[in-house]
């Protein structure tokens, strides 16, 4: 705070033009080598360089950014995009990056792992029905099929945490500008994927019941 006063950095509440910085999934699991889904790009250092540029951007624009909105991809083991959710006829789980299509579900190639039903508080028959509904809904959108991702961004893990350099820059901003960051948790619904911070990929189950909702607070 003393540093901010010395350098003429105002409180965010005094901004006449309010600027939000939305930082999408700047987490170890995606952004640092040797973590689960590191995005290296062609150079092998893509996400690392992105982190560096982002941190520099925060410090260079400290007095202009009103509030920072970091999104946090947040998962547990038993979710519709993880291997534990599925079994084949012999009880085996799919490997990472397996695609689960409508035909796979219809033909019994992959089905819901009924052992999870008590823990998830759902009926195994309903979960199987949901899996068919879900893959059909994805196919109807024409975007992609259901992918079984490696376990990543696991809640409470080091991989789930923000990249340390960015977290430090965000903390510095929050103190200097007296502006609390607004964390946007996504991806914690069991029965739907949630790539965008604005909302999940599928909003309802086969019975019409909601399985997720758009993030209206962030949208507005």
Name each model feature, range by range.
Residues 1-69, 75-220:
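Active-site-adjacent betaalpha module
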